[in-house]
């Protein structure tokens, strides 16, 4: 296991440097924060996972929940390293068993995510993981679903925060502690 101290820079700066900005994608005016270069580097992926593991190793967790879709990339790795279970929170219609659903607002319209109704039990301690916090809608929906099942949502975690979009402030105001590795200004 590589220690974060083996990274060539400060671990946070190292992760930040591996995130590519793609202007005007998927639409004009958007600065898309692409994590694929980070994932393509074994060293960067190890540093990222170690940051999450070091944060939660003593948190007495039962599960790491991952938000569809890019939260699925990191969350199961972190769950494995912590020897806890993984709970998928999926876009509607993707889970085969009985589910609970939660809708949230998008810029134009709504989206819905769901969780298996037996994904966790009352009192289970869970951290929600996603790649990025923008408006906070998906993470808030995940929080609401987990709490509806009786779980204790310990924290929300993401690689990137886009604080100018207000999602992290919204989540904190709703009582969800947050951990993000790095942040970028703007959209």
From Swiss-Prot:
Domain of life: Bacteria
Transmembrane stretches, start-end: none
Keyword Secreted among UniProt keywords: no
Pfam families: Pribosyltran (PF00156)
Subunit structure, interactors included: Homodimer.
Keyword Oxidoreductase listed: no
UniProt main location, coarse: cytoplasm
Function: Catalyzes a salvage reaction resulting in the formation of AMP, that is energically less costly than de novo synthesis.
Family: Belongs to the purine/pyrimidine phosphoribosyltransferase family.
Subcellular location as annotated: Cytoplasm
Molecular-function GO term, any one: adenine phosphoribosyltransferase activity
Protein name in UniProt: Adenine phosphoribosyltransferase
């Amino acid at each position: 296991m590589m220690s974060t101290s083996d990274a060539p820079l400060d671990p946070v700066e190292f992760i930040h440097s591996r995130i590519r900005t793609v202007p005007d994608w998927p639409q004009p005016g958007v600065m898309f924060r692409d994590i694929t270069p980070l994932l393509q580097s074994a060293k960067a992926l190890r540093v990222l996972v170690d940051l999450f593991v070091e944060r939660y190793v003593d948190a007495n967790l039962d599960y790491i929940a991952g938000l569809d879709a890019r939260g699925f990339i990191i969350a199961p790795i972190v769950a494995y390293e912590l020897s806890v279970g993984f709970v998928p929170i999926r876009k509607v219609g993707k889970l085969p068993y009985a589910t609970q659903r939660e809708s949230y607002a998008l810029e134009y319209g709504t989206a819905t995510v769901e969780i298996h109704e037996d994904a966790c039990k009352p009192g289970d301690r869970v951290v929600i993981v996603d790649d990025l916090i923008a408006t906070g809608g998906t993470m808030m929906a995940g929080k609401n679903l987990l709490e509806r099942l009786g779980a204790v949502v310990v924290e929300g975690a993401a690689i990137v925060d886009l604080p100018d979009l207000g999602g992290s402030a919204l989540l904190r105001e709703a009582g969800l502690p947050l951990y993000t590795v790095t942040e970028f200004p703007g959209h």
